[in-house]
């Protein structure tokens, strides 16, 4: 029997499943798209010149839907960030997901960039479930989000659950989710599994947990930046009955499924930023509903192979035309400036220098994970700056002593959340030393920084509140606020005819030198 079904706004035909027959199911998935709408230069690859793009990914998804029966599409969170997401309060991201035909998503930490109330309003307007089984209003058992859902297509019923882990929670500005309690996931997941198991053919868990992803354009090619999926393996082992787990937050790409040795759960994740589409095809036994065969991979989104989907392009063009002010050029650079996650970087140095110049503070700091895009060579538009630092945050001036500064830098050198980018200091470190004892020397203008020295520092409010695990920042006293980070940077560009690439060398790793000497 042939029946019609809806997917991404177009009506397709698919063959229904006869009871007792083996079933083929294709699960497509994304994570950490983070409003990465356009293809980028694939300078780390030798098989394609460009990679990614939402419109190009949509074409790939539509092609797979035409070729394969019973296709489902999921996302594991972090759909918001960037200029257009900010200007629309996240509305554009959801509209694109509707056009692409998503069946369900989990909540990511970026969904709270505009506060819990804005996100609640947006998620309640979309036709697919936005899931967070461990989200509750503080001091109550009242859920903030739907825990799970059943998606049925052609007689195949999939139970989908969403959760967020504690590392992802710590990446949210605390005041933005103050009324919410994000609880440990295992109990919430098991509760949903128990409710779903007898009602569905397959259970899919969408997670947003593990270590924070490294914010670097070519992260997939740098072995130092590869994250593990231990948190997902552990959760899949702690909860009985999960067939498939699609993860997010760590951008820990899995070229093929990882199988939990105790439960058999298939675990996958992409590298994020819409550079790859996750693919997992399953064969289910028609009688037992057990997975008898699987084939999983990550498909690079090659723009030369998959052209842009017209509906997505039209939506992007319409929204961009609504905000012509962000396309205004505010300055130019002498060369492209790149981000690095665990190294001193051009973009990080520039922002820290800007904070010092604009505030008059002694020292400038910015967390490497906040820098979301490289700055192009030549003309720089407002949208480029908003996409580089997409958060609604102020530059805060604080009074800190030398001990607090040193502890912040030791925390940075664990690389748990990337390297803290700085201005006004000279730092030498040795990664072979134990954590929190890696600083070899810390000076300002050639003078050693002592524990009781007093400094004014300028940094984003996220750090000021202790975000990214920096406990010494909230200990210090706030003495000023010079405005939004993006506005401070825009004014700097407007005030300089050509913005030069800052000199490197303010943070020096002597580990390699020691190894050579030995």
Locate predicted features.
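A glycine-rich phosphate-binding loop feature that marks nucleotide/adenosyl-phosphate handling sites
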Residues: 297-301, 332-337, 365-378, 423-433, ...
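Hydrophobic, well-ordered secondary-structure elements that form the walls
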Residues: 355, 401, 457
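C-terminal catalytic subdomain
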Residues: 378-419
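Glycine- and small-hydrophobic-enriched helix-loop-helix hairpins
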Residues: 465-518
């Amino acid at each position: 029997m042939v029946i019609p079904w809806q997917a991404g706004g177009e009506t397709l035909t698919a063959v229904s499943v006869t009871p007792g027959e083996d079933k083929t199911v294709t699960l497509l998935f994304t994570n950490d798209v983070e409003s990465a709408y356009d293809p980028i230069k694939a300078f780390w690859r030798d098989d394609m010149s460009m990679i990614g793009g939402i419109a190009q990914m949509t074409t790939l998804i539509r092609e797979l839907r035409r070729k394969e029966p019973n296709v489902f599409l999921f996302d594991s969170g972090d759909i918001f960030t960037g200029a257009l997401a900010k200007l629309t309060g996240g509305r554009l991201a959801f509209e694109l997901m509707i056009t692409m035909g998503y069946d369900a998503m989990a909540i990511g930490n970026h969904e709270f960039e505009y506060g819990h109330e804005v996100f609640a309003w947006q998620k309640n307007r979309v036709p697919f479930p936005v899931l967070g089984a461990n989200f509750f209003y503080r001091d109550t058992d009242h859920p903030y989000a739907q825990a799970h859902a059943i998606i049925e297509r052609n007689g195949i019923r999939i139970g989908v659950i969403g959760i967020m882990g504690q590392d992802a929670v710590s990446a949210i500005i605390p005041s933005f989710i103050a009324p919410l309690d994000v609880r440990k996931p295992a109990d919430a997941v098991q509760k949903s599994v128990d409710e779903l198991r007898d009602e569905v053919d397959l259970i899919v868990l969408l997670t947003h947990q593990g270590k924070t992803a490294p914010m670097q354009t070519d992260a997939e090619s740098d072995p130092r930046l590869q994250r593990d999926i231990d948190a997902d393996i552990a959760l899949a082992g702690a909860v009985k009955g999960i067939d498939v787990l699609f993860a997010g937050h760590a951008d820990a790409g899995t070229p093929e499924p990882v199988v939990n040795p105790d439960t058999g759960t298939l675990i996958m994740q992409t590298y994020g930023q819409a550079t790859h589409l996750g693919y997992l095809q399953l064969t289910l036994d028609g009688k037992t509903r057990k997975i008898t065969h699987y084939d999983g991979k990550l498909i690079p989104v090659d723009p030369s192979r998959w052209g842009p989907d017209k509906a997505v392009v039209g939506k992007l063009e319409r929204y961009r035309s609504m905000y012509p002010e962000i396309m205004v050029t505010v300055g130019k650079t002498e060369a492209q400036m790149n981000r690095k996650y665990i190294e001193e970087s051009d973009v990080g140095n520039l922002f820290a220098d800007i904070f010092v110049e604009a505030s008059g503070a002694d020292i400038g700091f910015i967390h490497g994970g906040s820098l979301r895009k490289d700055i192009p060579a030549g003309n720089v538009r407002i949208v480029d700056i908003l996409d580089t630092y997409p958060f609604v945050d102020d530059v805060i001036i604080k009074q800190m002593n030398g001990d607090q500064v040193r502890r912040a830098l030791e925390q940075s050198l664990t690389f748990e959340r990337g390297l803290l980018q700085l201005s006004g200091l000279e730092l030498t470190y040795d990664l072979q030393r134990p954590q929190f004892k890696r600083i070899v020397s810390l000076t300002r203008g050639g003078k050693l920084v002592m524990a009781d020295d007093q400094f004014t520092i300028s940094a984003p409010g996220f750090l000021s509140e202790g975000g990214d695990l920096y406990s010494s920042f909230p200990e210090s006293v706030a003495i000023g606020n010079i405005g939004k980070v993006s506005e401070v940077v825009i004014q700097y560009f407007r005030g300089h005819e050509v913005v030069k690439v800052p000199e490197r060398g303010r943070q020096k790793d002597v580990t390699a030198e020691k190894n050579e000497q030995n």
